[in-house]
Amino acid sequence: MIDTAGLRIMRAISEQGSFTAAAHSLGYTQPAISQMVRRLEGRIGTPLVERQGRTVRLTQAGQVLARHAVTVLSLLDTCLLYTSDAAD
């Protein structure tokens, strides 16, 4: 199963273009991002990034996941907003 942290990481890597920048934007360390990506790749069973020196490039599978991550995270935020409003 993919958790929201994994989705947020893939979205950040897609937007930032590197593990270091993604880590900075999310408040993680670069090694933590690397470890989370490896774990996510293991769960999915396919590479999500191609490492090229200090930059990374999303594979086709990584691009698909990052694109859907944006949608899923937006829907989750909307759901939480409506749930909070309903509780008031």
Residue ranges with predicted function:
Residues 77-80:
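A short, exposed helix-loop element centered on a Lys and neighboring polar residues
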Residues 82-88:
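Conserved small/polar residues in nucleotide/adenosyl-binding loops
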